């Protein structure tokens, strides 16, 4: 653990409240983390998709643990606010691998992780979560363990019973040691409210165009709002627009909204 890790862990945990939901604009490298921190972020969350893309890999448990953790360590060293890492399914084939990944995350100085179930059976993710919790306990670390349920995001199972299945998974994951439940892919207020009402730990949703604003989500009981890979996608879209402008019309107008060179350079030059 780093010297600042216990204080950052306590701060990060305290930020999860529906009265003022924790808003996370997910970063994928040091520069994006510094820009997001300078914009007023109380914490930095990584996006596994954005990290993978920036390192030349597709998302989906393809990136190696070593490369992912090196990036987490660099981000932690570059910012003053707490950092939580998206570690996909745990970067490994079994619970023991997940425990090793979590030990690496803690060694990097992060104070939280996201672990997703994807298409795995609920019991398998519960085992991975329990291993993650035990790994943190062995290190004497206060790790915020956020369990991601992909039933809505991936459209898994019968739509008529999807909410019931999601809640069953949430309860199982909390019993396994999860401190928070992340349900991406949900945008309608009735479902969000039902999730918040029936889940005993802080609820995290993923936001984007069409999602209620942060304050509205808080009123529904949401304690944490993430943009996921959205900021990275927007950044790459800006790069594509600039290239299409240049190669299509020979123009440069799409560069007008860029961050000024001195400002960006200063963010990466001074002390954190």
What is each residue range found by the language model?
Residues 255-272:
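A short, charged, Gly/Pro-tolerant segment at domain boundaries
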């Amino acid at each position: 653990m780093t010297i600042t890790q216990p204080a950052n862990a306590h701060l990060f945990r305290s930020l999860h409240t529906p009265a003022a939901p924790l808003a996370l604009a997910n970063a994928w490298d040091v520069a994006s983390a510094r820009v997001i921190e300078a914009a007023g972020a109380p914490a930095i969350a990584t996006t596994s998709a954005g990290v993978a893309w920036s390192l030349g890999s597709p998302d989906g448990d393809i990136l190696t643990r070593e490369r992912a953790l090196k990036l987490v360590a660099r981000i932690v060293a570059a910012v003053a606010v707490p950092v939580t890492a998206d570690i996909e399914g745990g970067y490994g084939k079994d619970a023991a691998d997940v425990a090793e990944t979590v030990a690496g995350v803690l060694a990097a100085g992060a104070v939280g992780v996201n672990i997703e179930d994807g298409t795995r059976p609920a019991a398998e993710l519960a085992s991975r979560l329990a291993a993650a919790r035990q790994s943190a306990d062995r290190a004497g670390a206060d790790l915020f363990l956020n369990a991601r349920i992909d039933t809505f995001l991936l459209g898994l199972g019968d739509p008529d019973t999807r909410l019931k299945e999601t809640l069953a998974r949430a309860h199982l994951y909390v019993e396994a040691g999860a401190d928070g439940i992340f349900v991406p892919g949900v945008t309608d207020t009735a479902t969000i409210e039902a999730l918040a009402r029936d889940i005993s730990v802080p609820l995290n949703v993923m936001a984007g165009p069409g999602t209620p604003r942060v304050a509205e989500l808080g009123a529904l009981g949401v304690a944490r709002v993430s943009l996921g890979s959205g900021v990275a996608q927007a950044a790459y879209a800006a790069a594509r627009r600039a290239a299409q402008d240049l190669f299509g019309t020979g123009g440069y107008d799409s560069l007008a909204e860029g961050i000024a060179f001195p400002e960006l350079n200063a963010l990466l030059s001074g002390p954190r």
